[in-house]
Amino acid sequence: MGFTDETVRFRLDDSNKVEISETLTAVYRSLEEKGYNPINQIVGYVLSGDPAYVPRYNDARNQIRKYERDEIVEELVRYYLQGNGIDL
C-alpha cells in the first residue's frame, strides 16, 4: 500500500489526556530520581518504542506502556501549543 497525496485526518480519544499528563509527570520524576536526563529518555522511548529507555523504578516502565506512543505525542503537541497561546 502506497502513500497518498491527500490529507488524512488523525483523531484520538480525549479521555486519556489527563492520565497521560499524570503518567508523563510520574515517569519524568522517576527518571530524574534515578539520575537520567528525563527528556532524553522519554524522547528515546517515544521515537523508538523501546521500553528500555524507561526504568522499572516506581513502575515507570509499565505506566508509560499503558499508552500508545501516538497518544503521548498528541498530548505533548497539544500541551506545547496551548502553552504558546493556541486555543484548541
UniProtKB/Swiss-Prot annotation:
The lineage of its organism: Bacteria, Bacillati, Bacillota, Bacilli, Lactobacillales. It comes from Streptococcus agalactiae serotype V (strain ATCC BAA-611 / 2603 V/R). This is UPF0297 protein SAG2091. Pfam families: IreB. PANTHER family: UPF0297 PROTEIN YRZL (PTHR40067:SF1). Belongs to the UPF0297 family. InterPro entries: IreB.
